[in-house]
């Protein structure tokens, strides 16, 4: 207000399945206490401003699509698969810039796709063998701790990656490779204009290199050429 700017509303990106039409979080594995809560209503009650919520990966996908349209000399990508790779894994799919939400807003959540490499690993969702248990920053840190390399948080893990610690770089690239092979199935089925990886791990070259190599290895050349 002091700067002469009026806040018109609040938008909140939530790390879990979201029914945006009803402004409710749906059984979030990492935030069980939020299940069924009308978050937008709670924000409005506290702040007196209109509010809306969206899944964080879906919001990231929309942001990437809109941002690229505003950049000169950059080809817009409006039909895309977006993967958020950070402490957890998330995903979204846009067609012509419109997020595909699916029944109840649950579309795009690739984190709990079962993958063979994760067989037997328990996931916070209650299942075993989910992608998130082998491709997220939390899972990388847990695996390194089991081998004697302990990092207190993911910020320390990423700092070690930037410092070029070989064991960390290897573990992060492996996670990127496993994620890439999973995403390759989606690319082959949906044939999007592009795949965008966001989240904290996307800033690590070893991770994105693993994703890219897996996509080229697992997808038809004709799809990758486009």
Where are these regions (language model features)?
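ATP-binding/phosphotransfer module of carbohydrate and carboxylate kinases, centering on a glycine-rich
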Residues: 1-8, 21, 45-49, 68-77, ...
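Phosphate-binding/catalytic loop of phosphoryl-transfer enzymes
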Residues: 6-13, 17-133
